[in-house]
Amino acid sequence: MYRIDVFSDWKMILLMSVIMLFQMLLASLIINYFQFSEYLVPISVGALTLTILFDARIGFMSTVAVSILVGLMMGQNIDFVISSLFISTVGVYNIRELRKRSQLFTTMFALIAASVVVIIAIGLFKEQSWAKIILDLQTLTLNSFLAPIITYGLIGLTEMVFEVTTDLTLIELLDYDRPLLKRAQRETNGTFNHSIVVGNLAEACATAIGAHSLLCRVGAYYHDIGKMIKADYFIENQYASDNKHDAIKPTMSAKIIRSHVNNGLQLAKEYGLPKIVSDFIPMHHGTTRVEYFYRQALEAVGGDESKIDESQFRYPGPKPNTKETGILMICEAIEAAVRSIKEPDILKIETMIDKIIKQRIEDGLSLIHI
């Protein structure tokens, strides 16, 4: 089922319903009560808002439904339906992959250009007077100018009321000047660089399969923030110093390594990370095993698995439950494994990737819901 995460959540269905019904109510007030031009009905506002909140498909399909319903309400006004669908489609296309806030306002010019095209086309086709065409053009241009501004305000309101995390918020979380990322750069520079590389890899993978690439990048930036606690116990942060794990037992080493998950969740809560981002912290390991220290412990008891409590070496989970968290789990493991290959070549890298994916599927990554 398409976007089961959205359509199985009553709050998201309520949000979509509220936006669509509000548009129809406004249309009724503008046309029947105030008797203004139908071109003041803010159909494109709903299209932009739903596209940013969810995705382009939901934004487009809801616009089709609302445009047709409002057109019928106006007495089968086909001109309104055509103009609304054309302009809203242009708007949806322009912000389908939002990467910066200014993109929302540059969409304003695309909407205005679309307004000019559709009004002149309809006017010429119906042989309307130029006075009528110019009047409709002025009205629709005003609508197109205000649409992104109103959308920007609505996004902030819906994020607060319905606890939705939009791409606009995710973009803000990528800012290196955010307190948590600045702290990560300062205290765990090795881990931070690793996270940037994993973010690039995860974003590319997500783009290739049609997943949420921006969310993958943001999740990668924050997935290892728990390593700021006891940073020097993680190999990427060990520069000239000795490996502290050499002086402690494998069970203690595994405990310290596993603790970065809970520490990360605590930091995420402290710094107010959205749940959709903090979910990457426990899910990027799922319930996999801290293999290196498990093997050390196994060697210490002569290979007798019955003498080892395996739960001491497993991450608490949960397993990834979205495409994005699944992608990060695989990319994070691949980045670390490929970096360890001596004299790497294409064949060695491909073999390692196949091995990692197979291991993750067998030990933590369920593809049933992904």
Where are these regions (language model features)?
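Generic detector of multi-pass transmembrane helix bundles and their immediately adjacent loops
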Residues: 2-192
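A generic alpha-helix surface/boundary motif
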Residues: 43-45, 88, 196-200, 261-262, ...
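A glycine-rich phosphate-binding loop feature that marks nucleotide/adenosyl-phosphate handling sites
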Residues: 107-113, 135-140, 175, 215-225, ...
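Divalent metal-dependent catalytic cores for phosphoryl transfer on phosphate-bearing substrates
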Residues: 181-343, 359
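C-terminal structured "cap/appendage" subdomains that terminate the fold
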Residues: 337-366
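Conserved small/polar residues in nucleotide/adenosyl-binding loops
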Residues: 368-370
